[in-house]
Amino acid sequence: MIDAHHHLWDLNAVDYPWLMEKGKKRFFGDPTPIQRNYLIDEHIKLAAALGFKASVHIQVGAADGLEEAKWVNKIVSENQSWPMAQVAFCDLSSDQREIQLDELQKLSSVVGVRQIVGRSPAEDANSKTNELLTSDNFMQGLQSISD
């Protein structure tokens, strides 16, 4: 069985601004319990105990999506006994999306990309993700990855 959606983070290796905001409630509740490193060894131990044999890391809102993807790619290459792929972040509304996609394609563990288009009404209004589905640039970005 494959764990098709999990996150890893090393707060010393990659910057996750949303994760480190102290005292801020998120759409999923209080982030305090997860404001710590969650690394591959812990994930493997927990996932294997549940019968998982492989996993897919999903991007988790790093300040620099490419930096996160490179970090995950390194984790994958250093842990050959645990098959893992990743879905990385790409800003599909950006004029630089083709460059981002080219860089991501150089990473052997990347099997897809995502850009979150909805979390909660308040967070979406603040981050403008609520406008993505009506954005011509975003729609062009979606089209570019389907070609």
Report residues per predicted region.
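Helix-coil boundary/capping segments in enzymes
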Residues: M1-D147
